[in-house]
Regions:
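Membrane-interface junctions at transmembrane-helix termini in multi-pass inner-membrane proteins
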Residues: 79-102
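Transmembrane-helix boundary and interhelical linker motifs in polytopic inner-membrane proteins
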Residues: 4-38, 93-98
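Alpha-helical transmembrane segments of multi-pass membrane proteins
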Residues: 44, 48, 52, 63-87, ...
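Hydrophobic/aromatic residues in alpha-helical transmembrane segments
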Residues: 12-16, 53, 87-88, 114-115, ...
Length: 181
């Protein structure tokens, strides 16, 4: 999860913070929406790779060491972590730290509620924990985007120039993230 978040921060969030403030509010929202769609595509790719990687590893090392049922919750946790991270960065970009605090409070509350439910149901295992993280991340991310007013799937024009500029900024950060890890 942390490696996926670091790569997405380098490829998307850092360019968003560098590019968006240079424009007026409407263009800034359009840039951020286009970058969100790009980040969503990257997250789906990372989630798919995580899903297939867990299944392949489970098959090789045995289901006892790494159950294949871990694949779905982990892949969804990658998507939830991404949604929450993007909502946080966008709220910080808009200089709304109270919304970031509300988003983090919601996330932590949902994770703790899910873990408490797992303990109460005597069902607390790896799949349950990743499921709690996924659910909390997706809920907090959706709430955060809704609160900031970003509509990433609306019409925001063509994104080629934004993607080109983001790649020009992010391509140098990705190798440093890989080396750091």
């Amino acid at each position: 999860l942390l490696l996926a978040q670091s790569l997405q921060d380098a490829a998307i969030n850092a360019p968003m913070v560098a590019l968006a403030p240079q424009h007026r509010a409407r263009r800034m929202r359009a840039i951020c929406a286009q970058l969100f769609r790009l980040q969503l595509g990257l997250s789906i790719l990372v989630a798919f790779l995580a899903f297939t990687g867990i299944l392949a590893t489970s098959w090789r090392v045995g289901a006892e060491a790494l159950p294949p049922s871990t694949a779905w919750p982990f892949a969804l946790a990658v998507l939830g972590h991404t949604a929450r991270g993007y909502a946080r960065d966008y709220a910080f970009l808009l200089l709304l730290p109270k919304r970031v605090l509300a988003l983090d409070t919601l996330y932590v509350g949902l994770v703790l509620l899910g873990l408490a439910a797992g303990v109460a149901l005597e069902r607390l295992d790896v799949e349950w924990v990743f499921g709690c993280i996924a659910t909390a991340g997706l809920a907090a991310g959706g709430f955060g985007l809704q609160q900031t007013g970003l509509r990433p799937f609306g019409q925001h024009g063509r994104g080629r120039d934004v993607f080109r500029k983001a790649w020009a900024l992010g391509r140098w950060a990705i190798p440093s993230v890989v080396l750091w890890w």
